[in-house]
Amino acid sequence: MAELLLGVNIDHIATLRNARGTAYPDPVQAAFIAEQAGADGITVHLREDRRHITDRDVRILRQTLDTRMNLEMAVTEEMLAIAVETKPHFCCLVPEKRQEVTTEGGLDVAGQREKMRDACKRLTDAGIQISLFIDADEEQIKAAAEVGAPFIEIHTGCYADAKTDAEQAQELVRIAKAATFAASLGLKVNAGHGLTYHNVKAIAAIPEMHELNIGHAIIGRAVMTGLKDAVAEMKRLMLEARG
C-alpha cells in the first residue's frame, strides 16, 4: 500500500483576500499554518485570469515552503514559462475555461498527445515532476503514460457530486479500477476535486493512492472551527480599548 500524503490547496484563502482587494488573508501565511498542521505539500492553481492565486503568491511560496509546492496550471505558453522559471516541485496540468467556477473535468490527453508530450518534456527538462489531471478512464491513463507523465491525478468530482449512494458507489469502483490500472503501467496515482470530510475515507482507502489534494472543504471547515476564537479576540480588543 502506497504512503498517503495530503496536499492542501490554499486557493480560497486568496479568493477571500481578492474579494476585498486587501493584503489579507495571506495565502503564504495559510501555507505555513497548513504545513505546521501536517500538510505534506501545498497546492495552488495559477489561473490565466489570476482570479485567486497571483504570480506574487507563487514566487513567495516557492521560496518559503518547507514541504513541496504543487502548481496547478493550464497547458499554455505563459504558464509553462512561469513554471520553468519558478521551478515548483510538481506541476499538475489541468484543463481550464475562463467561465468555469472550478475545474470541471479532466484533461483530454488522448486527444492532444503531441501538445502534452511537449509540455511534459519541457517541464521534466526543468527538473519538475509532472502529474496530469484526468478522468478515471483507461484511454486517458494510457495516454498519460505514453506522453511521459510519472503521475496522474484522478478527477474525483463525479464521485463527490453523486446524488445517490448507489451512484457514488459506482464512481468509487470506477476510480479504484483506474488507480489499479494506472499503477500497473508504473504511474503514481493522486486524486482530488470535491473531496470533503464526509467522502474522503473511501478514496483514501484505495491502496494505490499516493496523495490527495484537498482545498475547499478544509478552508470551509477552518472558517467554522476558527470563527469562535476570531470573534472572541475581536471583542477582547474592543473591551481592552475601553479599559
From Swiss-Prot:
UniProt GO molecular function: pyridoxine 5'-phosphate synthase activity
Positions annotated as active site in the UniProt record: 45, 72, 193
Keyword Cytoplasm among record annotations: yes
InterPro entries: Aldolase_TIM, PyrdxlP_synth_PdxJ, Pyridoxine-5'_phos_synth
Cellular component, GO, one term: cytosol
Site entry: Transition state stabilizer: 153
Keywords per UniProt: Cytoplasm, Pyridoxine biosynthesis, Transferase
Record pathway: Cofactor biosynthesis; pyridoxine 5'-phosphate biosynthesis; pyridoxine 5'-phosphate from D-erythrose 4-phosphate: step 5/5
The reaction(s) this protein catalyses: 3-amino-2-oxopropyl phosphate + 1-deoxy-D-xylulose 5-phosphate = pyridoxine 5'-phosphate + phosphate + 2 H2O + H(+)
EC number: 2.6.99.2
Annotated positions binding 3-amino-2-oxopropyl phosphate: 9, 20, 194, 215-216
TM segment ranges: none
UniProt record, GO biological process: pyridoxine biosynthetic process
Compartment annotation: Cytoplasm
Description of how the protein assembles with itself and partners: Homooctamer; tetramer of dimers.
PANTHER family found in the cross-reference section: PYRIDOXINE 5'-PHOSPHATE SYNTHASE
Its biological purpose: Catalyzes the complicated ring closure reaction between the two acyclic compounds 1-deoxy-D-xylulose-5-phosphate (DXP) and 3-amino-2-oxopropyl phosphate (1-amino-acetone-3-phosphate or AAP) to form pyridoxine 5'-phosphate (PNP) and inorganic phosphate.
Family: Belongs to the PNP synthase family.
Name of the protein: Pyridoxine 5'-phosphate synthase
Organism whose genome encodes this protein: Shigella sonnei (strain Ss046)
Gene encoding the protein: pdxJ
